[in-house]
């Protein structure tokens, strides 16, 4: 998976769509979640540098009081992203849902995933298994979050079970909602793959 993961923005290839994987903005203690902060900053960097034209914000919206896509949208607009370049996926309950829905609902088969490196590995594993072309922009991770890394260990086993044993699909699919392509010029090197 290493050839598909980019740690440096300047090395990241252009793709029309960047998919920001959701997480809570705050911990239960009320402290800002650094994973969230780094993902938002990574999305702003990719967008502002012209590496992506649209940001698909995929996250959990299970409760009226908890809405990851809308929270990300507000912060990205505050950061200067044009609201017309933001698409919301309210059914990104888990990584498998976010990746597969990007292909099957938002009609995008070649995109940049924006998340931390450890999460990139699982997201790309799912994408490649499903025949989806994706690359990942690996944003920084907080250094002292052992509980998240422990959770990731379990999530990887869950992903293997979902793909190979249960053959799970996203919880919700729905009608096709293509992300617009006509508003932006596509650079000449848009089809370069690692």
Model-predicted segments: where are they?
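A structural signal for short, hydrophobic/glycine-enriched beta-strand patches
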Residues: 1-150
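N-terminal membrane-anchoring alpha-helices
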Residues: 1-15, 171-178, 182, 187-193
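Low-complexity, compositionally biased segments
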Residues: 10, 78, 100, 155, ...
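A general structural signal for short secondary-structure boundary/capping elements
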Residues: 62-67, 135, 158-164, 181-186
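A transmembrane-helix-recognition feature enriched in membrane-embedded lipid enzymes
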Residues: 146-172
């Amino acid at each position: 998976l290493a050839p598909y993961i980019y740690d440096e923005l300047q090395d990241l290839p252009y793709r029309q769509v960047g998919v920001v994987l959701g997480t809570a903005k705050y911990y239960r203690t009320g402290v800002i979640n650094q994973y969230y902060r780094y993902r938002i900053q990574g999305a702003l960097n990719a967008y502002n540098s012209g590496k992506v034209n649209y940001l698909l914000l995929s996250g959990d919206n299970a409760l009226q009081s908890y809405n990851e896509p809308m929270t990300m949208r507000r912060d990205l607009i505050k950061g200067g992203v044009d609201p017309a370049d933001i698409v919301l996926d309210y059914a990104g309950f888990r990584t498998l849902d976010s990746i597969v829905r990007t292909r099957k609902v938002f009609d995008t088969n070649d995109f940049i995933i924006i998340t931390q490196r450890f999460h990139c590995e699982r997201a790309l594993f799912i994408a490649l298994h499903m025949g989806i072309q994706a690359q990942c922009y690996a944003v920084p991770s907080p250094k002292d979050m052992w509980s998240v890394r422990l959770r990731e260990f379990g999530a990887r086993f869950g992903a293997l079970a979902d793909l190979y044993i249960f053959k799970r699909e996203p919880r919700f699919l729905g009608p096709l909602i293509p992300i617009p392509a006509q508003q932006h010029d596509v650079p000449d090197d848009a089809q370069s793959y690692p």
